[in-house]
A protein has these predicted regions:
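Conserved GNAT acetyl-CoA-binding A-motif
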Residues: 128-129, 157-170
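Conserved catalytic-core motifs of GNAT/GCN5-like acyltransferases
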Residues: 166, 184-202
């Protein structure tokens, strides 16, 4: 893929369907429920929860299609559109909970959230910033899009004066990407859930000192 054809820009609402599709495929949400609508609602809810914490966004687009996205949150800035995004998140929760399978999935998400809180607490909880969400379409992995997006986020956080940052990832992702960039694994925990199929993830928290990385 020619890097000249890749556009890096802030996220817009028109990008949401593309990003939700990346989320659904990356975490295999379709395998979690017999109702295909649940996977879409889950992806929508996950994106809205990440947007609530983000103070920076960047998408990589080719011919108008988003193929990668990164969201970062700095404690030194306030997320934009907080009220609108909170309402959007509540609406996404309501849609997910309209079905029994969706309610089961909601419990699953709650387990993820609790695990994140536990991992962050055990890691010391003393960070200036977070990579809220980072993913690329599987068709573009290995093309350098991920490197470009990650570099953009680090540039922003360095401008914010960030000294330490963290992110959550899991065994369904290419977590080795972070280790190659100097991030240290600070904790891990296994989560299992089986509404209709076996689903198991090893969840990780990684940390980075930006001064040491620069």
């Amino acid at each position: 893929m020619n890097s000249k054809h890749i556009t890096l820009r802030p996220i817009t609402r028109k990008d949401y369907p593309f990003i939700e599709d990346i989320i659904r495929k990356t975490w295999k949400y379709d395998a979690l429920s017999s109702n295909p609508k649940d996977a879409k609602h889950m992806a929508r809810l996950y994106l809205r929860s990440c947007l609530l914490r983000a103070t920076f966004s960047c998408v990589a687009a080719v011919d108008g299609k988003v193929l990668g996205v990164i969201l970062a949150g700095s404690k030194k800035s306030v997320p934009k559109f907080a009220l609108r995004r909170t309402l959007a998140q509540l609406w996404s929760i309501a849609l997910l909970f309209t079905t029994k399978t969706g309610r089961d999935i909601g419990k699953f998400f709650s387990t993820f959230d609790q695990t994140d809180v536990e991992l962050l607490k055990n890691a010391g909880n003393a960070f200036d910033a977070e990579i809220c969400f980072f993913a690329v379409d599987e068709s573009t992995r290995g093309t350098g899009i991920g490197k470009m997006l990650f570099a953009k986020a680090l540039d922003y956080l360095e401008q914010e004066g960030t000294k330490t940052l963290y992110l959550f990832t899991d065994s369904s992702c290419t977590y080795q990407f972070y280790e190659k960039r100097g991030m240290q694994r600070l904790g891990e925990k296994t989560v299992e859930f089986s509404p209709h199929t076996d689903y198991r993830l090893n969840m990780f928290i990684y940390g980075l000192e930006l001064q040491a990385a620069s």
